[in-house]
């Protein structure tokens, strides 16, 4: 769903049975305001929050360093603040973008890629919440 807690989001959770929500956000302070409102909306409507994901949390430069251009740790901190599971950090990555543009998930085309392993780790955590 788009960010926020407006009519679209509220109608969606009221009209469709949802087993759980995964909140995905960039780590910027402004985006985290929407995350907090989203958590509150899901709690008020009785939708279980399966966890939070920090998207575009960093990119790895040619020098091997991680650059955190959108901030650092805000999504994980928010998960702790609201006692929700933090599912992981997803980096900016050219291979991920290319696979998405080609319509072929990276986890399928390159299952041993480090980003594929991050996605699979997150998927395992989500699966555990249903067991």
Task: Please provide the spans of the model-predicted regions.
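Short, intrinsically disordered/low-complexity patches at protein termini
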Residues: 47, 111-112, 130-131
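Short boundary/hinge segments that flank catalytic cores
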Residues: 86-88, 108, 117
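Conserved catalytic-core segment of NTP-binding enzymes
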Residues: 1-98
């Amino acid at each position: 769903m788009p960010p926020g807690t407006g009519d679209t989001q509220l109608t969606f959770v009221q009209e469709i049975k949802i087993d759980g929500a995964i909140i995905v956000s960039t780590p910027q302070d402004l985006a985290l305001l929407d995350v907090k409102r989203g958590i509150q909306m899901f709690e008020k409507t009785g939708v279980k929050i399966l966890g939070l994901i920090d998207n575009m949390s960093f990119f790895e430069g040619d020098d091997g360093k991680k650059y955190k251009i959108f901030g650092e740790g805000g999504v994980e901190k928010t998960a702790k603040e609201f006692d929700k599971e933090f599912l992981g950090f997803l980096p900016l990555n050219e291979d991920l973008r290319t696979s998405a543009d080609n319509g072929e998930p990276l986890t399928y085309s390159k299952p041993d890629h480090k980003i594929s392993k991050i996605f699979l780790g997150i998927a395992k955590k989500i699966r555990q919440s249903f067991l």
